[in-house]
Amino acid sequence: MKCPHCGNNGSRVVDSRPTDEGRVIRRRRECEKCGFRFTTFERVEATPLLVIKKNGSREEFDRDKILKGIVRAAEKRPLNMEQMTDMVDKVENKVRSLGESEISSQIIGEYVMNILVDLDEIAYIRFASVYRQFKDMHVFLDELQDMMKKDEEKEKE
């Protein structure tokens, strides 16, 4: 593996362990030339999955695009990168477990929101406002009222 520090092609594996319930191998490597240590992740290459966007166009499923949306929604919130990456893993696993070659962006967005609402309600509202394209304050307030009703129901249980 090429060293990200000096560009040398030789490195050795210092530590290797499974993560993400065994679906990913995390490897700590050390450059044989400069001694720089870095981490790599190895996962099974998944079959192509196309996302059908709202306008009908299709693009390949992109984990990073989902992560960027979550990071943007969680800005200045108490969610760490590991929690957000775990969210993306859960969404991708759920999407791929459906066994379909295509999935709508709406379904992916709903999966993200279903996980995000339990982790951070403010980040959820931010994500939902972009994803659902709130047209005005009334739609925004309706979403907040729905969340408040769900909270009240949880408290009664």
UniProtKB/Swiss-Prot annotation:
User: Which intervals of the chain are annotated as region Disordered?
Assistant: 1-21
Record's PROSITE patterns? Answer: ATP_CONE
Secretion signal: which residues? Answer: none
Chain intervals annotated as zinc finger (unnamed): 3-34
Keywords, in A-Z order: ATP-binding, DNA-binding, Metal-binding, Nucleotide-binding, Repressor, Transcription, Transcription regulation, Zinc, Zinc-finger
Does Oxidoreductase appear among the keywords? no
- Keyword Zinc listed: yes
* Family membership: Belongs to the NrdR family.
Q: What is this protein called?
A: Transcriptional repressor NrdR
Biological source species: Pediococcus pentosaceus (strain ATCC 25745 / CCUG 21536 / LMG 10740 / 183-1w)
What gene does this protein come from? nrdR
